[in-house]
Amino acid sequence: MPFFYKTPSGADLLNTQTPGAYKQADLLVTSKIIPEGGSSSQVINLAVQEITIMNDAASGYSYFVGELPTEVHRHIIETYVRLSPTLTDTLTYEFRSPDVVSKIYYNKGLVWDIANLKQNQWMPIIVVR
Protein backbone atom coordinates (compact mmCIF):
# COMPACT_ATOMS: atom_id res chain seq x y z
CA MET A 1 0.00 0.00 0.00
CA PRO A 2 1.59 3.33 -1.03
CA PHE A 3 2.00 6.08 1.59
CA PHE A 4 2.30 9.72 0.44
CA TYR A 5 3.08 12.64 2.81
CA LYS A 6 2.40 16.28 1.89
CA THR A 7 2.25 19.65 3.57
CA PRO A 8 -1.05 21.61 3.46
CA SER A 9 0.44 23.63 0.57
CA GLY A 10 1.24 20.42 -1.36
CA ALA A 11 5.00 20.11 -0.75
CA ASP A 12 6.27 16.53 -0.88
CA LEU A 13 7.48 15.49 2.60
CA LEU A 14 9.30 12.44 1.22
CA ASN A 15 11.33 14.48 -1.28
CA THR A 16 14.79 15.22 0.12
CA GLN A 17 14.69 18.67 -1.53
CA THR A 18 11.70 19.72 0.60
CA PRO A 19 12.65 21.58 3.80
CA GLY A 20 11.68 19.44 6.80
CA ALA A 21 11.22 16.30 4.68
CA TYR A 22 11.29 12.91 6.38
CA LYS A 23 14.52 10.96 5.95
CA GLN A 24 14.50 7.45 4.52
CA ALA A 25 16.86 6.27 7.28
CA ASP A 26 14.31 7.32 9.95
CA LEU A 27 11.30 5.56 8.39
CA LEU A 28 10.09 2.42 10.12
CA VAL A 29 6.79 0.54 9.84
CA THR A 30 5.99 -1.91 12.65
CA SER A 31 2.73 -3.84 13.09
CA LYS A 32 1.35 -5.46 16.22
CA ILE A 33 -0.12 -8.80 15.20
CA ILE A 34 -1.56 -11.94 16.72
CA PRO A 35 0.10 -14.93 15.03
CA GLU A 36 -1.82 -17.88 13.61
CA GLY A 37 -3.39 -19.85 16.43
CA GLY A 38 -2.40 -17.20 18.96
CA SER A 39 -4.48 -15.28 21.45
CA SER A 40 -4.60 -11.60 22.35
CA SER A 41 -1.99 -12.31 25.03
CA GLN A 42 0.49 -13.48 22.36
CA VAL A 43 0.95 -10.21 20.48
CA ILE A 44 4.18 -9.82 18.53
CA ASN A 45 5.69 -6.88 16.63
CA LEU A 46 6.51 -7.37 12.96
CA ALA A 47 8.71 -4.71 11.33
CA VAL A 48 9.22 -3.99 7.63
CA GLN A 49 12.96 -4.55 7.22
CA GLU A 50 13.69 -1.77 4.74
CA ILE A 51 11.68 1.22 3.56
CA THR A 52 12.51 2.51 0.09
CA ILE A 53 11.26 5.90 -1.09
CA MET A 54 10.17 5.84 -4.73
CA ASN A 55 8.81 8.41 -7.17
CA ASP A 56 5.31 8.19 -8.62
CA ALA A 57 5.69 9.29 -12.23
CA ALA A 58 1.98 10.07 -12.60
CA SER A 59 1.78 12.51 -9.68
CA GLY A 60 5.43 13.54 -9.32
CA TYR A 61 5.28 12.82 -5.58
CA SER A 62 7.48 10.47 -3.60
CA TYR A 63 6.03 7.56 -1.65
CA PHE A 64 6.97 4.39 0.17
CA VAL A 65 5.17 1.08 0.24
CA GLY A 66 4.04 -0.01 3.69
CA GLU A 67 3.45 -3.73 3.70
CA LEU A 68 0.58 -4.45 6.08
CA PRO A 69 0.59 -8.05 7.39
CA THR A 70 -3.06 -8.92 6.78
CA GLU A 71 -2.63 -12.45 5.54
CA VAL A 72 -4.98 -15.21 6.62
CA HIS A 73 -2.51 -16.42 9.25
CA ARG A 74 -2.17 -13.14 11.10
CA HIS A 75 -4.55 -10.71 12.73
CA ILE A 76 -3.22 -7.17 12.62
CA ILE A 77 -4.03 -5.03 15.66
CA GLU A 78 -2.39 -1.73 14.75
CA THR A 79 0.58 -0.38 12.85
CA TYR A 80 3.09 2.28 13.83
CA VAL A 81 4.75 4.49 11.21
CA ARG A 82 7.87 6.19 12.54
CA LEU A 83 8.59 9.24 10.41
CA SER A 84 11.38 10.69 12.56
CA PRO A 85 12.97 9.90 15.93
CA THR A 86 10.33 12.12 17.59
CA LEU A 87 7.26 11.43 15.41
CA THR A 88 5.36 8.14 15.23
CA ASP A 89 1.84 7.81 13.82
CA THR A 90 -0.68 4.99 14.36
CA LEU A 91 -2.87 3.07 11.93
CA THR A 92 -5.87 1.14 13.22
CA TYR A 93 -8.26 -1.09 11.31
CA GLU A 94 -11.80 -2.34 10.83
CA PHE A 95 -12.26 -5.77 9.29
CA ARG A 96 -14.88 -7.11 6.88
CA SER A 97 -13.80 -10.64 7.84
CA PRO A 98 -10.94 -11.91 10.00
CA ASP A 99 -8.43 -11.49 7.18
CA VAL A 100 -9.90 -8.67 5.04
CA VAL A 101 -9.38 -5.05 6.09
CA SER A 102 -12.37 -2.85 5.27
CA LYS A 103 -11.19 0.50 6.69
CA ILE A 104 -7.89 2.02 7.78
CA TYR A 105 -7.61 4.93 10.19
CA TYR A 106 -4.48 7.08 10.39
CA ASN A 107 -4.24 8.78 13.79
CA LYS A 108 -7.98 8.06 14.16
CA GLY A 109 -8.91 9.70 10.83
CA LEU A 110 -10.36 7.48 8.07
CA VAL A 111 -7.86 7.33 5.19
CA TRP A 112 -8.79 4.13 3.36
CA ASP A 113 -12.11 2.41 2.72
CA ILE A 114 -12.50 -0.79 0.72
CA ALA A 115 -15.85 0.53 -0.53
CA ASN A 116 -13.97 3.21 -2.51
CA LEU A 117 -11.57 0.85 -4.28
CA LYS A 118 -11.55 0.75 -8.05
CA GLN A 119 -11.27 -2.68 -9.60
CA ASN A 120 -7.71 -4.07 -9.56
CA GLN A 121 -6.28 -0.87 -8.09
CA TRP A 122 -4.93 -0.15 -4.60
CA MET A 123 -5.90 3.17 -3.14
CA PRO A 124 -2.95 5.09 -1.64
CA ILE A 125 -2.84 6.53 1.84
CA ILE A 126 -2.24 10.29 1.57
CA VAL A 127 -1.29 12.10 4.77
CA VAL A 128 -1.28 15.90 4.97
CA ARG A 129 0.89 17.32 7.78
What is the meaning of each model-derived region?
Residues 1-33:
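N-terminal export/targeting and maturation segments
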Residues 4, 30, 34-129:
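Extracytoplasmic cysteine-anchoring/structural motifs
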